[in-house]
């Protein structure tokens, strides 16, 4: 391809909203055009990257028996109502909902578990067809409250989603292992630093679940890693530091604490460490159409993990109650809530069990109690694990070694769903006794745009993008000084030779200075530059410079040999762009 024919442009400045590196560089380098907030157009440059990324995905999924399908973007509400997810998703206000001319409710697809379950239920004829692995690569929609970070959190995005159907839990596990390995190979081919971590299934399902995270400072997710084990902070089991508490139980004292509401204020007021203060938080839960409130007690030096609370209470969703809700249901202001005489069900974290003579609120404004004790002063509650893991906490899955904390961008998620969806749609087969058995289902997804954005966050430098060879739009840029007719003739000859062999060169034939072209090539992230400089006339050697700065010289006669050793050949994967005469 010649730059004079390529529909693109570079710019010195990105959109003011480009708050992260990937978004900024994709705009500056001419890969992405903002159509509206959270909605983007892919330019010819980026579409080439997308095609190569999706080709890698197809190769790896086809290799394990995946069959590609195309499922509808427009989905009827009645399918979602069968699984109970219609109201759950509506409550979060993340669905794009519309009605057709017959007044039937529809949504734009955020995922396809319901649709694919209905499809397989109608077409599955017998056990001999199992396991089934269907996948697609297509657009998804999510009405983000705050779309930001470009492709990281968009309203419309490209995803690969796979669905497996098996005849038993064992076969489901086999399919899970195959998809897990295929996803690893996909990310390995991009040369990304990533971790696979245990995760919570959220609204998709409560079975076995893992996330793939690309490590980078931008990452919205906090990852706990200890040795070879990793977990999303929401799912990480951790052993926090323990403390020795008094064995001599002291008499309770009520203390006036005017407007002392926070743990930090209490720490100063009582001159006592946070781990001797009991913190009581009120959470609001949702289960289908019902809302309930619970009190959760944790140590004052720790933070609550709402995902763990929701799992413990077996509810769909959980969030901290607002000040207005607390006042309405507990008749006391936030900051003065305690477990004693609490009017709502109360639970406590395991780390609070050994606490003695602790400080806590007692549901009276401007009053706290000293020397409170479980059993003596407060009825012993049910205990659970409600803590958010922190750096230095010990990892029970790694022999008690400490956790390190990293930031990561979630680029893929894999789930075992069991029979949650197949039961709703009666997806099953007859066993040898003639009895109906349900299929066991798995669901898996890769965020294509997020993966490429994470790739940029991890690999880019102060010059611009740095694409892995596997997905770069062009493998090598051919550069010469504008106005150099001899250099132009040589460049054209080399370009035609490389193009014929499928090495995907980009010929910068603009009438610009060589220095300008070099900077543009770096901004675009092309892995190699083939430079026809001043020294070529005297030495007859071409200069090749990698995106990372390594240089070598090669003669025109040996160029194809060098390319065959260092560049991928995409002749069969990406059709060459048609050029005008």
Curated annotation (Swiss-Prot):
It is found in: Cytoplasm. GO terms for cellular component: cytosol. GO terms for molecular function: aminoacyl-tRNA deacylase activity; ATP binding; proline-tRNA ligase activity. InterPro entries: aa-tRNA-synt_IIb (IPR002314), aa-tRNA-synth_II (IPR006195), aa-tRNA-synth_II/BPL/LPL (IPR045864), Anticodon-bd (IPR004154), Anticodon-bd_dom_sf (IPR036621), Pro-tRNA-ligase_IIa (IPR002316), Pro-tRNA-synth_IIa_bac-type (IPR004500), Pro-tRNA-Synthase_IIa_type1 (IPR023717). It catalyses: tRNA(Pro) + L-proline + ATP = L-prolyl-tRNA(Pro) + AMP + diphosphate. It holds the Pfam family tRNA-synt_2b. It is an enzyme of class 6 (ligase). Its EC number is 6.1.1.15. Keywords: Aminoacyl-tRNA synthetase, ATP-binding, Cytoplasm, Ligase, Nucleotide-binding, Protein biosynthesis. GO terms for biological process: prolyl-tRNA aminoacylation. SUPFAM superfamilies: Class II aaRS ABD-related, Class II aaRS and biotin synthetases, YbaK/ProRS associated domain. PROSITE patterns: AA_TRNA_LIGASE_II. Belongs to the class-II aminoacyl-tRNA synthetase family. ProS type 1 subfamily. Consists of three domains: the N-terminal catalytic domain, the editing domain and the C-terminal anticodon-binding domain. Catalyzes the attachment of proline to tRNA(Pro) in a two-step reaction: proline is first activated by ATP to form Pro-AMP and then transferred to the acceptor end of tRNA(Pro). As ProRS can inadvertently accommodate and process non-cognate amino acids such as alanine and cysteine, to avoid such errors it has two additional distinct editing activities against alanine. One activity is designated as 'pretransfer' editing and involves the tRNA(Pro)-independent hydrolysis of activated Ala-AMP. PANTHER family: MITOCHONDRIAL RIBOSOME PROTEIN L39/PROLYL-TRNA LIGASE FAMILY MEMBER, PROLINE--TRNA LIGASE. Homodimer. This is Proline--tRNA ligase. The lineage of its organism: Bacteria, Pseudomonadati, Chlamydiota, Chlamydiia, Chlamydiales. The gene is proS.
């Amino acid at each position: 391809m010649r730059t004079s024919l390529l529909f693109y442009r570079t710019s010195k400045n990105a959109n003011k909203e480009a708050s992260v590196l990937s978004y900024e560089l994709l705009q500056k380098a001419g890969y992405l055009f903002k159509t509206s907030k959270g909605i983007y157009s892919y330019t010819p440059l980026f579409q080439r990257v997308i095609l190569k990324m999706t080709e890698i995905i197809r190769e790896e999924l086809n290799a394990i028996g995946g069959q590609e399908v195309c499922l509808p973007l427009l989905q009827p509400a009645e399918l979602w109502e069968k699984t109970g997810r219609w109201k759950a998703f509506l409550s979060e206000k993340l669905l794009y909902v519309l009605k057709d001319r017959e007044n039937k409710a529809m949504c734009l697809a955020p995922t396809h578990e319901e649709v694919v379950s209905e499809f397989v239920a109608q077409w599955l004829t017998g056990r001999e067809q199992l396991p089934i692995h269907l996948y697609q690569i297509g657009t998804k929609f999510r009405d983000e409250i705050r779309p930001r970070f470009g492709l990281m959190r968009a309203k419309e995005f490209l995803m690969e989603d796979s669905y497996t159907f098996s005849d038993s839990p064992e076969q489901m596990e086999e399919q899970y292992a195959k998809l897990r390995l295929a996803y690893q190979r996909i990310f390995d081919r991009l040369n990304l630093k990533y971790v696979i971590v245990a995760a919570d299934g959220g609204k998709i399902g409560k079975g076995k679940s893992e996330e793939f995270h690309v490590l980078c400072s931008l990452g919205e997710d906090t990852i706990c890693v200890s040795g070879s084990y990793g977990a999303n902070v929401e799912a990480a089991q951790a052993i926090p530091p323990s403390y020795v508490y008094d064995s001599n139980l002291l008499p309770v004292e009520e203390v006036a604490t005017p407007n002392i509401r926070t743990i930090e204020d209490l720490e100063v007021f009582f001159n006592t460490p946070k781990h001797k203060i009991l913190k009581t938080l009120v959470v609001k839960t949702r289960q289908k159409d019902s809302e309930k409130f619970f009190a959760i007690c944790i140590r004052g030096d720790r933070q609550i993990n709402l995902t763990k609370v929701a799992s413990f209470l077996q509810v769909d969703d959980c969030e901290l109650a607002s000040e207005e809700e607390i006042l309405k249901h507990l008749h006391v202001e936030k900051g003065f809530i305690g477990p004693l005489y609490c009017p709502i069900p109360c639970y406590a974290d395991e780390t609070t069990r050994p606490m003695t003579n602790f400080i806590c609120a007692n549901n009276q404004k401007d009053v706290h109690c000293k020397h409170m004790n479980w059993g003596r002063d407060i009825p012993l509650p049910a205990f659970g694990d409600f803590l958010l893991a922190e750096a230095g906490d010990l990892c029970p899955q790694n022999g008690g070694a400490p956790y390190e904390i990293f930031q990561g961008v979630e680029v893929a998620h894999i789930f075992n769903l069991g029979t949650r969806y197949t039961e709703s749609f009666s997806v099953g087969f007859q066993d040898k006794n003639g009895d109906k058995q349900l299929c066991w289902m798995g669901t898996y997804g890769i965020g294509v745009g997020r993966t490429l954005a994470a790739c940029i966050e991890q690999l880019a430098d102060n010059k611009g993008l740095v694409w892995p060879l596997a997905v770069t739009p062009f493998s090598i840029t051919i550069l010469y000084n504008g106005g150099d007719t001899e250099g132009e003739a040589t460049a054209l000859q080399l370009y035609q030779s490389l193009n014929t062999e499928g090495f995907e060169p980009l010929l910068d034939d603009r009438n610009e200075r060589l220095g300008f072209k070099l900077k543009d090539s770096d901004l675009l992230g092309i892995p190699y530059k083939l430079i026809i400089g001043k020294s070529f006339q005297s030495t007859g050697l071409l200069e090749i410079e990698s995106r990372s700065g390594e240089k070598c010289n090669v003669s025109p006669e040996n160029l194809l040999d060098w390319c065959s050793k260092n560049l991928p050949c995409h002749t069969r994967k990406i059709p060459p762009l048609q050029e005008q005469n």
